[in-house]
A protein has these predicted regions:
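Exposed boundary/loop context
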Residues: 7, 11, 73, 117, ...
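Extracellular or lumenal secretory-pathway regions
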Residues: 17-121, 126, 140, 171-279
Length: 279
């Protein structure tokens, strides 16, 4: 195993004493499925007596710095894996950034596992193998009955023990549990999950979500475009470090952005991937 687990030993008698059980997973993932290398970041799984939340550690870090130093920074989680659900539930509230908006939508994501007899040891923990198909991908999980939480990364839950390792068959997404801790208080995510640093999540449905994403793809610089007119030669707009002087240059940037969006179209739920047209 590449990463040494630094799991805090959680005694069964301690499960009801802390308000939040936090598990941190290292996520290795491919934004483009054809790439060889991986992006890496840490994801947080928070389990409270009533709710379960999964989100990027960058959100919590930014929120903590804002509170500590009176800052007003923001952070956009681009993993598409920010979710919240009630304990012991497959009904998820999903959170997503689209352009400058922040939205939430509901899904029911039942997971049917096939538990194998195969086991392995990681440090002092015995892990058991389980497989499932979810989101258009085939998944293998290794869970630990000694840690009696039926949770895991993202929406992958429902096993008789905490998931320590999780990966899809093509190794596009690889999760490894690296740390855990017990928080004495119910950790508030109100400023970065239920809202995104000042932008409260707007409830939508999945059909509306696809419409918003496609609108962004069709014209990713719609706001900038509204500020342009071909007769206004003095207006200059900076996009990704490049100075744009007219609509023709903006159109070139639009095509470049669309190429990037199509290239990095490898969501964890691949069966819900967007089918972007090429203009």
């Amino acid at each position: 195993m590449k990463n040494i687990l630094t799991i805090v030993v959680i005694l069964l008698t301690g499960f009801t004493q802390a308000q939040t059980h936090r598990f941190i997973y290292e996520l290795q993932y491919k934004m483009d499925s054809t790439e060889i290398g991986y992006e890496k970041l840490n994801m947080i799984l928070d389990i409270t007596p009533k709710e379960v939340k999964f989100y990027g550690k960058g959100l919590a870090t930014t929120d903590s710095l804002n509170k500590k130093f009176g800052m007003n920074s923001s952070y956009t989680d681009m993993t598409g894996q920010v979710v919240k659900r009630k304990i012991n539930s497959f009904d998820n509230e999903n959170y997503i950034n689209i352009k400058n908006g922040y939205y939430s939508f509901k899904t029911t994501d039942k997971i049917n596992w096939l538990i194998a007899d195969e086991t392995k040891k990681i440090e002092n923990y015995t892990l058991q193998k389980a497989t499932t198909k979810f989101g258009g991908r085939n998944w293998t999980a290794w869970f630990c009955k000694e840690i009696p939480f039926n949770e895991g990364p993202f929406k992958l839950r429902g096993l008789p023990g905490l998931i320590f390792e999780l990966s899809d068959a093509k190794k596009n997404f690889i999760y490894t549990l690296v740390k855990s801790r017990k928080l004495t208080e119910n950790y508030s995510t109100a400023d970065f999950l239920e809202s995104n640093f000042g932008n409260k999540a707007i409830p939508i449905n999945e059909k509306q979500k696809y419409k918003l994403i496609m609108e962004f793809y069709n014209d990713p610089f719609a706001f900038e475009r509204n500020n342009f007119s071909k007769s206004n030669n003095d207006l200059k707009i900076n996009i990704n470090g490049k100075e744009i002087h007219n609509v023709d240059e903006l159109n070139t940037q639009t095509k470049s952005m669309q190429e990037v969006i199509r290239k990095y179209n490898n969501p964890i739920e691949i069966d819900k991937a967007m089918h972007y047209p090429i203009y």
